[in-house]
Amino acid sequence: MTHPVTPKNTTRPTPANKPAASTLHPRNPHQGRYDFDKLIKALPELEKHAITNPSGEATINFSDADAVLTLNKALLAHHYNIKYWDLPKGYLCPPIPGRADYIHQVADLLNNNNSGSENKKPHVLDIGTGASLIYPIIGSQSYGWYFTATDIDPVSINTAKAICEINPNLKKLVTVKQQKNPKNIFKGIIGEHDYFDITVCNPPFHGSMQDVLDANNRKQSKLQKNRARRNPNGQANKFADAKNNLNFGGQNAELWTEGGEFSFISRMINESVGYAQQVNWFTTLVSRAENLKPLDALLRKVGARQIKTINMQHGQKASRILAWRFK
């Protein structure tokens, strides 16, 4: 029997189900603070990680990789009916609220424009699904979409296949396919007779492993300064704001590519021209705002008929979706 969560070594926290001001998409179920009572009911093992922050609110230690992974398992179990989900050690553990926002935004894009396959469930192509399979999980369970999920990493592919195989609600909607040539994005994946309503992608952000390490050091330094400012008495504080995860890990292919984000998306744009009649909308996340202007120029150069930028804000983090089509 599962009892309401009482975080260890503390009194009962302030209820976590009071919604806070949110910039998430209105259909995103991850509004406000996490409801730990419901999450623990969905996944009892989360209870051992439950603690309170200095404000007396239920949370976890976001610098503990196992706690973060367990929280994600609980979120997927509670909101998306995923009974089995796990990651190989060192692989990217995604922030689910932000990933869900991308899916809900592209759902609006499909609803507001001719999807190209009327009266049929949309078929979505996920470029670089990773071991987490996060976009196919959210999209298939939120909207009933079909997904083809791709990656170049064999460990990610095998993990994603295992997640699909064990969860019947995914097995009938999600196909996992390995990209054999790391230089290609769509080639070798989109067959001659395939049609996709939309593509999604969270591209590698950095240009080298050194860039990854430097960025992580800057992030850790900033977090330590913020914690010190919040705790002027020097009291130990291992808490991070819920949903600002500092322990996501990640393999090389998930974190960096030669030339960084701009180079990867530029390759995607150039390659998309050859599939202009087989994909209704191409989309990708763009983390660096300064990349938008040159990417827009490239899209105009290759003949994109429609170009859209959809801004997203998750706490202190701003990102945007770049979408284009040739129809």
Swiss-Prot record:
Cellular compartments annotated: Cytoplasm
GO annotation, biological process: rRNA base methylation
Record-level GO cellular component terms: cytoplasm
CDD domains: AdoMet_MTases
Matching Gene3D superfamilies: Vaccinia Virus protein VP39 (3.40.50.150)
Residue segments, region Disordered: 1-31
Sample GO molecular function, one term: 23S rRNA (adenine(1618)-N(6))-methyltransferase activity
Annotated EC: 2.1.1.181
SUPFAM superfamilies assigned to the protein according to its UniProt record, in alphabetical order: S-adenosyl-L-methionine-dependent methyltransferases
Catalyzed reactions: adenosine(1618) in 23S rRNA + S-adenosyl-L-methionine = N(6)-methyladenosine(1618) in 23S rRNA + S-adenosyl-L-homocysteine + H(+)
UniProt keyword list: Cytoplasm, Methyltransferase, rRNA processing, S-adenosyl-L-methionine, Transferase
Any single Pfam family the record assigns to this protein: Methyltransf_10
Family: Belongs to the methyltransferase superfamily. METTL16/RlmF family.
Primary role: Specifically methylates the adenine in position 1618 of 23S rRNA.
PANTHER family with a match to the protein in the record: RNA N6-ADENOSINE-METHYLTRANSFERASE METTL16, SAM-DEPENDENT METHYLTRANSFERASE
The protein, known as: Ribosomal RNA large subunit methyltransferase F
Native species: Psychrobacter sp. (strain PRwf-1)
Lineage: Bacteria, Pseudomonadati, Pseudomonadota, Gammaproteobacteria, Moraxellales
Gene: rlmF
